[in-house]
Every structure is written in C-alpha cells, then in structure tokens.
C-alpha cells in the first residue's frame, strides 16, 4: 500500500519547513511591546546558521487587536520589521492570528467580555475581521510562507476542553476563519494551529475534526509533548501521531514538539530531539517546527513564567542566544534532509498495515467514549512493535469501513480554474467526497487552492498515478 508522504511545494526557498516557534527573549509573548530589532536579528541569525529555514510567529491577540474595530498599527510596523529581518537572511515565517493561549495561560482582549469564541456571531465576526486585516497587511511580504489561524484553540476556546463545541460548530468557525484569509488575498498554505488534538488522532471529541475541516486547510499540524513510561514508546509518539494525522492525505507538519531542559539533561534532550526528528520523518512528517527558539531566564517574574517556570527553558538556544543541544540536533537533521534531496523523496510502499479501529472515532451502539483511550494505547503499542521489528506499515481502516471508492484525487481530471496568484502549482484536482476510509484522502487541499495545489504526494492505496514531485527528475523512497 502507498503510505502518506505529501509535501508542501509552494515556496521552495524555505522548504521543507525546518524551524522554531519564535518569541524573542526580550519579552516572550509580550515581545511586541518590548521589540528590539537588533536582538531579533541576532536570534534569527543563530537559527539560520544552524540550518533552520523558517519560524512560526504570533500576533499576541490582546495587543494587536485592542479594540473590536481597531488594529495596533505601531505593533504592525514592528511585525513588518520582523518580516524584513527574515527576508534579509533568506528565512520565512508562518504568522499565527488568534493567540489567546500561550505556555500555560490564556489572555483575552479586554473587549471579549466572556463571549463564546465559536458560537457568538459577533465574536466570530470580530475574529474573522482581525484575520482579514492582518492578512491584507502582510500577504505580499516575501517572508510570509503560510498562515495559522490560532494557537491551540481547543484549550482556549473552551478552557480545559470542558463542554467542547460540536464538530459542526467548530467546522463552521474554521470555515469563516480560513475564508477570511482567502478573501483578503492570502494565497499561502493555511491551517488551524489546533494541535491536531481531535478525535481522529486522540479519540477525544473536542469538536476539531481533521476530516471535517480538511476542505478549508492545506496541511495538518500535530503538537506533541506527551511523555511515557517506556523510552521506545516516547521516542515514537510523535511519529505515531503524525501517522494518525495523515487521515486526510494532506501534508503533516510537526508544528510543535520539544521539551524543557528543566526536566532533562542536555545529553538526553539531544537524544529526544534526534529520535523525534528521525522517527517522525519515517512516520510521514514533512515539516518540523520546534518549541521554541530561546530560553527566558530574564522573564522569570512575568506571566506565564512566574507560575509555569519550566516554560522558560524549552529553548533551542539559551537566554543569551548560545546554541543548546537540541539546536545542534536540528542542524544535523538539516544536513540529512539536504543529503537525501528530501523534496524528491517519498516513503516506500508497505506490504503490511495497521488497522485503525473505527471505534476510535465513531459512536457505535453500546460503545463508550471510555473505550477510546484503550484503543489508542493498543494501537500505539502495535506501532512501536512494528518499528522495533523494522516492519514498514501503513495505516488503514477496516475493510467494512472502506466501500468501493471513486478514483483518488490524483487520478481525476484537473480543475479548469487558473492557479491562484502567488501559489506554486499544477492545476488542482476536483474535491473528492469525504470518506471514512484511511486508505483514501478525505479531501483535496482547501480553498487555499481552489485551482491551485500547495502540496504534492498521495497516500491513497487506490491511486493509479505516481507521486507527483515539483521536479520529476528523481524520486527516492525511504522506509
């Protein structure tokens, strides 16, 4: 069976994405108040010198959107300088719009007034307005290589994910946000920034469904920090979640991963990064964004670090900008990607499969939500066993979950609409009907690319076309 290995192709100069989530050491989440152009450039230079191609950046929502109908133009100019700093050294960045949750604390704009972020119509409108305003300002800057709607919205929209919204509600909200990007002229790939913590990956229904939102996004971005009592399970956890997150057939970017060096030695931090990077590569990830760029020792008396002090030391550089062990591992990984000509690689086909029980995400009669963690744990252990045996496997659903499917999207006639401006592409495939099968993609890229394609590759077992690459000169398979 063909295994998932879809890649983004829209911005070759900074692809594959290998980067860091970025807050400057001058302020953490409040960096835009304390913005120091010289320090930011020094921080970016260290990342670039170690092979990183991009960052993920953040519009701290209370500061950038201080009034319902007002954007802080001073902070926007500082952000533009931040973008210029990326361009100066050939890096890109993925701005994140709705940043109300960060590192163990939630922050609201003062005007929110307790309104629901998903179901209050006025509040949804204000979010969409902010997304469109920021997109219009920065969509044409060459440093912008993608967009994320939120940071970990499941933990912000409903704190602790208590009383989560329905999938219909979240999908409508996601549609409004992604459509705001497109209506404002943003052509770069977009995703939600939710962490891929929904039912297809975790078995927990928090309203965020990869299948249901696939129509509107261009890639999936797992956030993986989970620890385990067993070293092989821990080293393979991110890879396992990337495999599950590939259910839509879209590129999987490991959008957040890392660890605090308050809890581990430098040597073991390096081991964790090395294992996570290489295992997730073999698990189908095609982008990696570490958490995060620096330590924050000088911010010990500010929130969130005064109450979550371990959050100060997730950095891949220390608080004066010197590389830590994880950054050296990222640099070595960058060399591996270069040596294997990663843009022209795809995963080797597999002769074996792990069956993902439909009970993980379906509410069958006499099934209980409490059963799902056991399904997840058993499947995780099965995956670890196959990797220990050096047995390449694909993920699939039960045969009864996989009725005869129409030709996969790679095999369909291309759409006739012209490519969207600024997006590298061949013509887009028509959207396939949503499927419950893990053997075929649930959808094509989102409206990002109605008439354009921002990614390449297919995981469908019924695909009759070879994997498409931006340059067809060579395709290398890996296990």
Each model region followed by its residue ranges:
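Glycine- and acidic-residue-enriched helix-capping/strand-helix junction motifs
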Residues: 361-383
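Active-site mouth of glycoside hydrolases
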Residues: 2-217, 229, 288
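A short, well-structured beta->alpha microelement
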Residues: 200, 380-403
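A conserved amphipathic helix/loop scaffold
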Residues: 412, 416-479
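Substrate-binding cleft/loops of secretory-pathway carbohydrate-active enzymes
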Residues: 190-230, 264-268, 281, 401-414, ...
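Hydrophobic beta-strand scaffold residues
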Residues: 54, 93, 190, 252, ...
């Amino acid at each position: 069976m063909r295994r998932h290995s879809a890649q983004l192709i829209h911005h070759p100069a900074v692809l594959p994405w290998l980067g860091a989530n970025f807050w400057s050491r001058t302020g953490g989440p409040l960096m835009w108040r304390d913005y120091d152009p010289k320090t930011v450039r020094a921080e970016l230079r260290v990342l670039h010198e170690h092979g990183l191609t991009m960052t993920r950046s953040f519009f701290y929502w209370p500061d950038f959107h201080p009034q319902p109908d007002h954007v802080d133009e001073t902070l926007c100019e500082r952000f533009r300088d931040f973008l210029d700093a990326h361009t100066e050294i050939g890096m890109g960045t993925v701005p994140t719009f709705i940043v109300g949750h960060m590192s163990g604390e939630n922050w609201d704009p003062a005007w929110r007034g307790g309104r629901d972020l998903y179901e209050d119509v006025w509040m949804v409108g204000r979010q969409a307005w902010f997304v469109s305003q920021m997109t219009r300002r920065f969509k044409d800057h060459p440093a912008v290589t993608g967009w994320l709607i939120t940071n970990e919205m499941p933990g912000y929209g409903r704190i602790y994910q208590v009383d989560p919204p329905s999938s219909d509600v979240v999908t409508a909200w996601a549609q409004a946000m992604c459509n705001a990007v497109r209506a404002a002229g943003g052509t770069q790939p977009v995703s939600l920034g939710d962490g891929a913590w929904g039912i297809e990956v975790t078995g927990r229904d928090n309203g965020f469904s990869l299948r249901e939102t696939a129509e509107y996004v261009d890639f999936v971005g797992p956030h993986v920090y989970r620890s385990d009592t067993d070293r092989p399970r821990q080293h393979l956890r991110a890879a396992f979640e990337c495999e599950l997150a590939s259910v839509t057939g879209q590129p999987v970017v490991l959008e957040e991963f890392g660890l605090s060096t308050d809890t581990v030695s430098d040597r073991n931090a390096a081991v964790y990064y090395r294992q996570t990077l290489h295992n997730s590569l073999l698990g189908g990830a095609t982008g990696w964004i570490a958490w995060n760029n620096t330590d924050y020792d000088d911010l010990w008396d500010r929130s969130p670090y005064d109450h979550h002090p371990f959050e100060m030391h997730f950095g891949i550089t220390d608080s004066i900008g010197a590389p830590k062990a994880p950054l050296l591992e990222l640099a070595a990984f960058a060399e591996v990607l270069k040596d294997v000509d990663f843009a022209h690689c795809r995963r080797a086909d597999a002769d074996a499969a792990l069956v993902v029980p439909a009970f993980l995400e379906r509410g069958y009669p006499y099934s209980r939500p409490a059963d799902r963690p056991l399904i997840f744990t058993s499947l995780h252990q099965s995956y670890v066993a196959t990797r220990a045996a050096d047995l390449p496997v694909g993920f699939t659903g039960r045969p009864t979950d996989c009725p005869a499917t129409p030709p996969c999207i790679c095999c369909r006639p291309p759409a006739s609409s012209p490519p969207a401006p600024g997006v590298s592409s061949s013509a887009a495939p028509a959207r396939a009907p949503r499927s419950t099968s893990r053997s075929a993609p649930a959808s094509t890229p989102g409206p990002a690319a109605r008439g354009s394609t921002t990614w390449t590759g297919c995981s469908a077992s019924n695909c009759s076309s070879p994997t498409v690459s931006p340059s067809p000169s060579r395709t290398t398979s890996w296990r």
